[in-house]
Structures are given as structure tokens and as C-alpha cells.
Amino acid sequence: MGRNAKIISKSKIRRVNILILILLGTQDNSFHRLLDKVQELIDKKVITEKVIVQAGRTKFESKDMEIYSLMPEEKLREIMEKSDLVITHGGVGSIVMALKMGKKVIAVPRLSAFGEHINDHQIQIVDSFNKQEFLIGLTELDGMEEALAKAKEFKPKKFKSETDHMIKLIEDFIDNN
């Protein structure tokens, strides 16, 4: 097989130059603000990559993005595995899933001021992961273009889940007692 050959997986998701996966979470409130910014950057040709979105309950239409409300976890994991960049809301589950796969992540917290969440706890979550250099945290969407440029060279610290460590300790305890 030549270097330029394209491999098509069983699910027909082709490897293109770069794939961006966007996760908005399953919160009842809309997070269209993030998709509005992504669409703006697509229109300006800042984003030229294929974009796949799991939008949750956010209603958004775009001819430039492949948008799903929800997808089975297996399909989500398959797409995430193929992605080069994950742009996600500030939910721990989405962030940790991407980090465990070694993905570059831009995390954008949902904000109560925009009616995206009931409080601003996602700011603290994103800030914590950002300070530890696991991801690029972004509270102001005006900085998205800069964050995308930074992501090209960004080398996230390797994420090790403490949950995995605790499970191993419990398994060792059970096996040895």
C-alpha cells in the first residue's frame, strides 16, 4: 500500500487531512455560542478541516459540519480515535475521554451568563486541566483562532487517571486477600 493510500474503516469514516471532533455535552441548555464561533471560523477559512459535532440538545444547522444530536458511545470513541483535535465543553467526562486517548483538547466551559448551564463550575474544571497543561482552556471565544493555532504545536502532558490507579489498587487487594 502506498503512502498516500486512504484506508476506509468498517464504519466508512475516512481519514482526511485533519479531523476536528466537537462535543457539546448532554446538558438541557443550548451551547450554540461555540458552534456559532466554529461556523464563523469555517466561513473565514480559518478552519478547513472536517468537523464532526456531537451536539447533544443544541439545535444547529450547518452545511459545513457533520452534526449528530447523540451517537452511540462506540461510534463516538471510534470518531474520537480518528480525530486530531477535540473541542469540548468543560464536562469532566468528555475531557477525560479525550485525554485518555492522548488527544489534543481545546476545552470551552459552558457559562451561566449565556444560559448554557445553571452555574459556572465548568470554568474551574477547565482551569484546573489547563493549569496542569493537559489541554488548552478557553473562556473567551474570541481567542478560538489563537487556540487553534496553538493546538497545532501543543504537546499535552500525558494524562493518567487516578480512577485507573484506584481500580488497580482494589483489584490487587482482592487478588491478594
What are the residue ranges of the model-derived segments?
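Catalytic phosphate/metal-binding cores of nucleic-acid and nucleotide-processing enzymes, i.e., regions
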Residues: I18, Y68-R77, L85, M101, ...
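Catalytic binding pocket for nucleotide-activated donors in carbohydrate/polymer assembly enzymes
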Residues: K104-T139
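Donor-nucleotide binding loops and adjacent catalytic segments primarily
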Residues: I13-K82
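Short acidic-hydrophobic, aromatic-tinged amphipathic segments that line or gate anion-handling sites
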Residues: I67-L70, L135-G143
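N-terminal amphipathic/basic-hydrophobic helices that include classical n-h-c signal peptides
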Residues: M1-I18
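C-terminal amphipathic helix plus adjacent low-complexity
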Residues: R3-I8, K150-N177
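Residues at secondary-structure transition points
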Residues: N29, L70-E78, H89, E116-D120, ...
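A donor-sugar binding/catalytic signature common to diverse glycosyltransferases
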Residues: L76-E116
